[in-house]
Amino acid sequence: MKNNEVSRIKLPAIFTDNMVFQRRAHVCIWGEAQDTEYIEAAIAGQIRRTKVVDGRFELKLNPMEAGGPYELCVKAMQTDEQGAVNKNESGTIAADTIVFKNVLVGEVWLAGGQSNMELELQNSDNGKEVVAHTQDDLLRFYYTPKVSYICDELLKAEEESCWMKCEPGTTAAWSAVVYYWAVRIRKELDVPVGIIGCNWGGTYAHNWVSRESLLSHERTAHFVTEYEDMVAHQDFDEYLKELDEYREYYKEWVKRVDACYAKNPEIEWSKVLEICGENRWPGPSGPHFEYRPYGLYESMLIRVAPYTIKGALYYQGENDENNNEIYDILLENLITEWRRLWHDDELAFSIVQLPVHDPDTEKTGRGWGGIRRAQDKICRTIKNTSLTVITDCGNKKNIHPTDKKTVGERLAENTLKDIYGLAGYNGNGARLAGYELTCRDGHEGILLHFSGAEDGFYRKKEDCEGAASQEELVRVDNPGEKMVFGAGDSKNVPLGFEIGSRNIAAGSDNDKNEKVTYYRAIAELAGGDIFIYNENVSGPVSARYGNDNYFRPIFLDKCGRPIVPFWI
């Protein structure tokens, strides 16, 4: 049930029937209470009590193993002058009581990020067929209301929100990535799973952290100061008028786009734009703007924190392309902030690295490569984090690729391996294990050694976009035979390997002005090693792989997974 309007107790909206509590953790129960001294919570044979202070309370349940269904009873209690708990005429405790039914205990995760995390199951590959067959009473989902600021609309949306069981009538709008992740986790751990969806398409990392967090670093403080300076000089009434006009325009634009796809599901995005026109996204900025700094932190994230969770699944970064040089700072701040908010210094983060995408046919951008590098750095340097590589799951023209099953299942594999510490799981392909500067057949280059490529490299039978299944793979290197691949494919799409040489700035008499320039590299395969070179590069000093917005990750392991991007 939801909070009783006449009750003296008010719990956050996320507490409803069918919720899932985190196993083996001190589950936090918190809220507000009026005209009462104590709050008592009882579940699965345990009773916990805490004092109400300044109208607020917080208590922790003792850790529980996976199980259920249970009832959670939360009571408001008074004491008499001697400090004894008051009882009514029947001898029972006099209290206002809220009872939550069908509560499970298992694994609880929050799903954060932007539109690729948000993309609904019904809109993913084979989505409608999958939705029709979803049925699992032990898999639950709570979607945090998407409202950009604190208002009556948000309070109403929270009142209507609830934990949903996995069944055809509910799963259509669930995150596709999360659904496939959760199904795999359910199968492997054999415990109930609860997901808290807390994401919004088009968002930046700085939307999901506090004002104080952004101000704490000199390279992120400008997000706050520039926004607040703009608001200080803004005519609020005029802003609201512009916002209403934009929202009405946006609704009509979406209708036109939907009509295009309804008429021709295979229509290219460029054709859609010809018909519907470019969207005037993202609309006017201001206090009600969903993309303002620290906005969704206030209207979404803290509305569900500190509901006890194991960790966060995080798929975001596309919109931070132009912030790629500071994205490592932004992502580290976000992890630190969320861990502070949940009072858990080891809150797990399972991060999806950006796939490939670049609709600009005139040039290949680098912003997404910078985001990938930051994501890689964070997951190598911050404890209890995991990175899932999906460079083979992207699409050049569509920023929202619809194969979310591969993404979700790989994310689950890496979560099981890196967060739960279970053997026998791995969602990523070959990883750079070492390298050496060497010369082959007169070419100066770098010999790359990989772990996870002991069986050599494979590629798809048909080198097209989308993830490869194991049945589609053919080995591309024969033992003892040298095979050479150019810097790009037949369509001049780069294969992702680059080699760097050091150029000394004119007039320099020391190494301080040295600069590394990268060139497309030719790849020569021999077993599980790759030798890269460029005929115009002598004295190579570095290499990188996966730094382009869009490249063709043709070298896969025997399970069809791409090489993990690297920078050396």
Locate each region found by the language model.
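Cell-envelope and extracellular/periplasmic
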Residues: M1-I568
